[in-house]
């Protein structure tokens, strides 16, 4: 079983975790001008 040889400092652990970001979903402008989330059915036009 893998065990760390030395303790990982708070700074080093934080530097590694900087890439664990949550990306916000970008709304897409539909044909009728309304915005919808990607891969969702538009409630107004009932289109995907």
Swiss-Prot record:
Disulfide bonds: none annotated. GO terms for biological process: translation. Signal peptide: none annotated. InterPro entries: Ribosomal_bL32, Ribosomal_bL32_bact, Ribosomal_zn-bd. GO terms for cellular component: large ribosomal subunit. Residues 24-48 are annotated as: Disordered. Keywords: Ribonucleoprotein, Ribosomal protein. GO terms for molecular function: structural constituent of ribosome. Belongs to the bacterial ribosomal protein bL32 family. This is Large ribosomal subunit protein bL32. It comes from Campylobacter lari (strain RM2100 / D67 / ATCC BAA-1060).
